[in-house]
Amino acid sequence: MYCLKDLKHLIYFEKLLENADNELVQKAQAEGDICLGYTCYHVPEALLNVGNCFSVRLRAPHTGSIDIATYYMSNYTCEYARALVERGIEGGYQFLDAMIGVDACSMMNRAMEHFEILKVNEKPSFFVTHCDIPYKITDYTLDSYVDQMRIHVLDRLTEVFGVDTSDAAIRAAVAEHNEVCSIISEMGEMRKADNPVITGYEFHVINLVSYTCPKRLILPYLRETLAELKKRKPDKVSPFRARVAIVGSEIDDPDLTKLIEGCGALVVSDRFCFGSTPGREVIELKDDEDALRQICLHVMEHSECARYIADEKVLQRRETADRLAKEYNAEGIIYEQMKYCDYWGFERALASHIMHDEYGWPVLSIDRLYNNGNSGQLRTRVQAFVESLEIKRIHKEEGKA
């Protein structure tokens, strides 16, 4: 379908996403680095890359049966949480040195509990830590959040592994984190073009490897890919029939983006968990303020998680979806939700109507399984949505004539 010249490292990036314990993770650990697993944006990524630590945002690629995890967690819990437990029981996370969990939702909390109870990692120094996450932004919730990160994350890393978690070390980690964010953001800006030099699938793959690989080892590939994209020539005519923004819960499977684009809809914005919004915004640090507190405030302010129930955050999520769809010239919005996701179940049901009725956006609202890249039913719904967007465009053009 695509005539764009293949990106040099795309196949390698896809290979890195085949397993959580990928080639670069193994290389970093062989060099003595400490691997920290996490699942949620509410664990500040930069903090997990302090000193000789590196973060891996956990996925369970090619998940098949999750029957054993379902036995422990019931079939009314989100499949992402169950897939992680299933992969852990299979031994797929033995490479981790620690698991940094957050009580962002009850299902992920249950998953982290099972990492401990079922002893899915046999390393003597392995530990699972849990952090409580706020529902709204106030001085006291920020104070609590900072304490949680200091006590349950930074102090534990120092106690168990002797990691330097000083203010200077945190700032160094943020500098490296910001370079990754700047590169991904610059690639993202390219998606605003009428005929972009990067597809949504390619961007999804590149963004995912930035979450799942050691920063110092993936950065050279990201730098080279950015330089390559700057010289890449777009197709003379775009092969896509529509442009869409995706909003919603966790998507770590780029095959879902591939499915949507295979239906003719170019994905131009990724406002979902594991996406670039939020997650790939540069963290601006002031020299005269505590770095940890600034990072925690940054995460709280930029979070688009449906966990936040304050009126201003609910409005922020809608305004962000509207802003991104406009900035990236989307013609419609796909609101998606992992099946049994409590927070996004409520958010999707309400916001999908509000974005249509009050903001005027064509909206496709879907709930989906964890791995949905080959769903015939979903493909049919996306194809119908693309056709509806084409019809709207035709009517709009006829109205101007």
Regions found by a protein language model. Give the residues of each.
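TerminUS-proximal long segments
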Residues: 317-325, 330-332, 336-342, 347-401
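A charged, amphipathic alpha-helical module
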Residues: 1-34, 146, 155-282, 310
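Short, acidic/turn-prone active-site loops that include or flank metal/cofactor-
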Residues: 59-65, 70, 133-134, 271-276, ...
